[in-house]
Amino acid sequence: MHFETVIGLEVHVELKTDSKMFSPSPAHFGAEPNSNTNVIDLAYPGVLPVVNRRAVDWAMRASMALNMEIATESKFDRKNYFYPDNPKAYQISQFDQPIGEHGYIDIEVDGETKRIGITRLHMEEDAGKSTHKDGYSLVDLNRQGTPLIEIVSEPDIRSPQEAYAYLEKLRSIIQYTGVSDCKMEEGSLRCDANISLRPYGQEEFGTKAELKNLNSFNYVRKGLEYEEKRQEEELLNGGEVLQETRRFDESTGKTILMRVKEGSDDYRYFPEPDIVPLYVDEAWKERVRQTIPELPDARKEKYVNEYGLPAYDAHVLTLTKEMSDFFEGAVEAGADVKLTSNWLMGGVNEYLNKNQVELQDTKLTPENLAGMIKLIEDGTMSSKIAKKVFPELAENGGDAKQIMEDKGLVQISDESVLLNFVNEALDNNPQSVEDFKNGKGRAKGFLVGQIMKASKGQANPQMVNKLLQQELDKR
């Protein structure tokens, strides 16, 4: 029997507002524990929540960017549960009347475009953070009350690979809107995954398991891959998949039972009595709609149609707004479009990955990268020299030409000097000269390599090729 995988994702995104969802406390990451709290966050008796209008605006902006309908009327509800990092013993959320519904995003997997539906986007407040030690627990309530949006997909995802693509696209869109930085390492983007299997052709869904502790997109994919195999083995062996919550163990790559899955009835939802329903008229919707910036799909189309980039380059460059903005800035500063694309996808990305830093953590600017690329383009700097100059540019900034001169890496373009290197290579490698005359094209490449080696990579490669051909023709 063959099974079809059915996946739905619940993504929590922290909004980067200055203050919290229902209190004036700061909502910034990284403060001293329990320093960003007040009487509302701590659930003192008699205090009343006040809705953060900026959070509502940004929830609407995210909804619109995800092609959702904005509800004219929505409301807040109490989700009741007890946990040490939840002082009220309930969370203010939206249950049956969310701010946004019926959206979608398009993803690309193996060159094919697929539309993934989005059921809803609702607003809620975040809980605090518990840290469990040996025999005791620590609670930090700085995060308590931070504005969240939860984005719930339709069960349209059919593989872990599609889930990964969906998360990449969703993060990209949200980052472009500016409502969140979506940093998983800081907890501003978190994901729970629901997965079930059913025989191919069956309409009814199978019993799902919910996966938690998915701290990166790779862990989402790995957790789903493991759970896919686990459920398939269970069903093929005549067993039954139970509705439960499981945790992904990063060290073993397996999912582990946490608890039997609760249903919505367990939370005893009821309307929040301290907050009136939220009414959004057309004028408010239009004001928010005007704030939506250019989104990744529009930029990707522009890069292909206006800049002439391959679709793959356009896809990579638009994955993050930071990289896309940097690319556009370098092009505006006069850098060649394709060379800039190649450097950002190649040398720049390699440097960032090797040093485990973000683009904003370096001293690179669109202008100083453009300056280096223009030197490559006009032949002043070879690609080999550029690779030696670039780390200095990224670490300390400055001017690429000045760095090249300070390091003694100025490209040799003097014809008489280059001819000496060329003739020396020809004299030292008579067999390669003979091979070239006999039609072996690789021999010329070898000779070029010898010349570049002798010049320590500083010979102008275009002139080397020209002079080498000229001298070979004489022999």
Curated annotation (Swiss-Prot):
Protein name per Swiss-Prot or TrEMBL: Aspartyl/glutamyl-tRNA(Asn/Gln) amidotransferase subunit B
Listed EC numbers: 6.3.5.-
PANTHER family: GLUTAMYL-TRNA GLN AMIDOTRANSFERASE SUBUNIT B MITOCHONDRIAL AND PROKARYOTIC PET112-RELATED, GLUTAMYL-TRNA(GLN) AMIDOTRANSFERASE SUBUNIT B, MITOCHONDRIAL
Gene3D superfamilies: 1.10.10.410, GatB domain, N-terminal subdomain (1.10.150.380)
Keywords attached to this entry: ATP-binding, Ligase, Nucleotide-binding, Protein biosynthesis
Annotated NCBIfam families: gatB, PRK05477.1-1, PRK05477.1-2, PRK05477.1-4
Family the UniProt entry places it in: Belongs to the GatB/GatE family. GatB subfamily.
